[in-house]
């Protein structure tokens, strides 16, 4: 792989990108079926690692043509890769059993040598209550309750001391989640779409990843301006609460580098579709279209064009400038070869000008994972 040398100085407020990642939905269509989609998803992670990407993320979505259960998928990917970190972006906590999720996460992390990074969210979407069951509070409050329980479980906290008779454990036994991965909690992030959720992440002492949809912005505020404000609030609150250096922040964005006229035309068409259809853009055949876009939501721009045009656009965007890690959001309907081309073109023509260096072949998982001064577990 030929990586172009950076040929320009970075703007003063632009943070060099410590890591380069990608976010895929591991989608499938009605023609090829889910098995092929899953196998191609594994191959995508293999190729990304070959290109020097430090992280790969998969989106979770229930009842659709996308990955519904990321952890067994990551366990499989881990057997085909060596050092790229594997992350969920994101797992909504509203419909998760926190103890079962902690058990599955610990098992997966140990199987893949400590490369798991889980981004979780506490969004207020209760769209599937009819399937998963209703609760006696609102969706966001319930999601936060489950998030708290999950974080305690993966930290190795005692969840219960047995006092009951005729149970599966002796009286006085302290019940903790096993198998326990001691460092996993330090690799949990909050998927943040608002200022409040970023502040909550800082209060909980977990990392932050910002995605392609934001809400609760100020009037007249652009996506990049609001994203930068969210990141700044996270770092400010982290420093105030923990008195340590905040962990690196990741930002997912559509950065589509057109290295040929045909690719530029294709990416411009996707840009137009995203600006007109919003979150419903780029759906694989048979996938469900959202009933509507969240009221007041901001959709991230698509950074597309020639390599030089993309570099200039990324360098001037406040949100991307504030991030430590750039995560390429892959259009959901794109196929394996199209996605590999996107990964390769970003890594070879644009990312070096953002201060990024590819992972080396001998890089271990502890080096590939996010580094920061975390609070005590």
What are these model-predicted stretches?
Residues 68-91, 146, 346-358:
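Alpha-helix-loop-beta-strand connector modules within alpha/beta enzyme cores
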Residues 2-16, 138-177, 219-323, 357-376:
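An alpha-helical appendage that flanks or caps ligand/catalytic pockets
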Residues 55-77, 92, 212-224, 327-338:
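Glycine-rich, proline-tolerant flexible connector loops at the mouths of alpha/beta enzymes
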Residues 13-36, 95-162, 208, 216, ...:
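Flexible, glycine-rich active-site loops centered on histidine and acidic residues
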Residues 52, 60, 77, 108, ...:
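Conserved, mostly hydrophobic/aromatic
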Residues 24-39, 91-99, 183-192, 256, ...:
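Active-site mouth loops of central-metabolism enzymes
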Residues 1-84, 368-369, 375:
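N-terminal beta1-alpha1-beta2 module of alpha/beta enzyme domains
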Residues 20-24, 56-58, 86-89, 116-120, ...:
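Hydrophobic faces of well-ordered beta-strands that scaffold small-molecule active sites
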């Amino acid at each position: 792989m030929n990586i172009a040398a950076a040929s320009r100085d970075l703007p003063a407020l632009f943070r060099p990108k410590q890591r380069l990642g990608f976010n895929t939905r591991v989608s499938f269509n009605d023609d090829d079926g889910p098995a092929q989609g899953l196998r191609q998803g594994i191959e995508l992670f293999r190729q990304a690692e070959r290109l020097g990407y430090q992280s790969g993320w998969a989106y979770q979505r229930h009842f659709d043509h996308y990955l519904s259960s990321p952890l067994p998928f990551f366990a499989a990917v881990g057997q085909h890769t060596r050092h790229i970190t594997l992350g969920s972006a994101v797992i909504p906590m509203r419909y998760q059993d926190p103890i079962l999720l902690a058990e599955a996460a610990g098992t997966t992390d140990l199987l893949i040598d400590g490369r798991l990074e889980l981004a979780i969210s506490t969004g207020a979407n209760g769209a599937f209550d009819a399937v998963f069951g209703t609760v006696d509070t609102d969706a966001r409050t319930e999601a936060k309750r489950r998030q708290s329980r999950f974080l305690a479980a993966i930290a190795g906290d005692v969840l219960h001391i047995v006092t009951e008779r005729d149970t599966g454990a002796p009286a006085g036994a302290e019940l903790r989640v096993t198998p326990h991965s001691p460092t996993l909690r330090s690799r949990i992030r909050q998927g943040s779409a608002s200022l409040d959720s970023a502040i909550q992440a800082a209060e909980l002492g977990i990392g932050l990843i910002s995605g392609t949809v934001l809400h609760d912005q100020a009037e007249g505020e652009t996506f990049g301006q609001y994203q930068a404000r969210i990141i700044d609030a996270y770092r400010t609150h982290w420093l105030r609460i923990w008195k340590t250096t905040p962990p690196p922040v990741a930002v997912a964005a559509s950065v589509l580098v057109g290295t040929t006229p045909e690719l530029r035309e294709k990416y411009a068409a996707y840009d137009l579709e995203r600006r007109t259809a919003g979150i419903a853009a780029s759906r694989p055949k048979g996938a469900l279209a959202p009933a509507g876009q969240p009221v007041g939501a901001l959709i991230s721009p698509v950074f597309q064009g020639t390599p030089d045009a993309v570099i200039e656009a990324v360098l001037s965007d406040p949100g991307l400038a504030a991030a430590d890690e750039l995560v390429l959001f892959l259009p959901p309907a794109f196929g394996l070869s199209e996605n590999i081309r996107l990964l390769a073109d970003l890594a070879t023509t644009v990312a070096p000008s953002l201060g990024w260096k590819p992972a080396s072949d001998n890089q271990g998982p502890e080096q590939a994972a996010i580094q920061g001064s975390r609070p005590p577990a």
